[in-house]
Amino acid sequence: MDWWDQALSMEHELYGFLPWPRVERAVFDAQISAGWMHSGYPFMAHDLSVPGVVNVSQMAEEGDWGMFHELGHNHQWMPSTLPGTTETGCNFASVHLMEDLVGISGHGAIIPEQRDSRTRSYFENGANISDWSVWVALETFLMVKEEWSWSAITTALSVYYDLPASEVPYTGEEKFNSWVLHLSNSTGMNLAPYHAAWGLPLDQSTFDSLDHLPVWVDDPLRGDYFEYPAILRGLHSPSISGTNSTNLSWETYDNGTNITLTVFYGESDGGLQQSAWSNSIVHGSTDVGDDYIEITGLSCCGTDYYARIRASNDAGETWFGPVTWSTDYSDD
């Protein structure tokens, strides 16, 4: 029983509902109400499982993914259970206990080759949220766990237990947005672009609420599975530039994947059509932080100019701007 006490304590701590209010009970029988095992109070399993679960040596060496999984169900909280993840969130317990208590991966579905193959297939097929469930969805959480440990997920889950009624998410869309907000705040990073890459339907208000946090720009999807767009902010030129030049500046908030920046400028705004611009400069790649480019060869003496920046990669392009300025009448 000491071994199972430890296992259950680890599950309680993982899901963050402490102190756990009850003793978990299990019933083993020749005929149960559904399946091989099922969650509930009591948790139920067939009597063929009894020899293993009372053999502490076997449990310590092999664990029992299914037992951990069903007991994980008993810890799920519906407001934090995203659409498609009923059979995912309970596997947090299975992964955690198999790895950190037993010391093995415990399931063929989470060996590196299977994880890579499943993730690659998901993104090659368009990263549709309708396909985001069970093992694919688990991968989304595992990548976060491997960057920040389970504690980030525990902290986010714990928020839900004390939410005022007005903030409890009910619809699928509310749950997706709420989770990304709480998990981002837990990690201290903006995880909206990461979850949007997986296909989660996020509102613009979620992106806006997190734009004070740095973007997770080295997540495992980047380059290998998904090409992110860049996000530039604060595109600026002095309203009165030099006689024949100006410095165009901006903040690269997210440098995306394999991004090339091109600056388009001219005496009229060409919009989002490359062919409508009279001049362009290829700036190339950009790093997170402040950046700029000097534009020279401008006409002097009060000539009005417009500029936009295009950030492009093989996945598409995003335009930023416009910004406007007028050239000075003298070098003074």
Placement of each model-derived feature along the sequence:
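Catalytic cores of extracellular degradative/oxidative enzymes
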Residues: 1-146, 154-157
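Recognizes extended acidic, P/S/T-rich segments that occur
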Residues: 260-301, 314-318
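Extracellular fibronectin type III
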Residues: 315-332
